From Swiss-Prot:
GO terms for cellular component: cytosolic small ribosomal subunit. NCBIfam families: S18. This is Small ribosomal subunit protein bS18A. SUPFAM superfamilies: Ribosomal protein S18. Binds as a heterodimer with protein bS6 to the central domain of the 16S rRNA, where it helps stabilize the platform of the 30S subunit. GO terms for biological process: translation. GO terms for molecular function: small ribosomal subunit rRNA binding; structural constituent of ribosome. Pfam families: Ribosomal_S18 (PF01084).
């Protein structure tokens, strides 16, 4: 016998769209040597923040991820957090 579904649907929250910072400012470039910029896209645990958290578009999120990985390879950024 099938269960009856008496749950109310959750009220829809308004979707807040963020504009990509790099699309808005065309002159701002993503470079692996700019660690101050890249640290804003890394969590305190050393993980790259998700696109839904940062609000970047697909292409710029890929560019940030690649720049963070390159900066880690040349020891400008840590692979993991230093605090335990």
């Amino acid at each position: 016998m099938a269960k009856s579904n008496k749950r109310r649907p959750a009220p829809e929250k308004p979707v807040k769209t963020r504009k990509c910072v790099f699309c808005a400012k065309k002159d701002q470039a993503i470079d692996y040597k700019d660690t101050a910029l890249l640290r804003t896209y890394i969590s305190e645990r050393g993980k790259i923040r998700a696109r839904r958290v940062t609000g970047n578009c697909v292409q710029h999120q890929r560019d940030i991820a690649l720049a963070v990985k390159n900066a880690r390879e040349v020891a400008l950024l840590p692979f993991t957090s230093s605090a335990r």
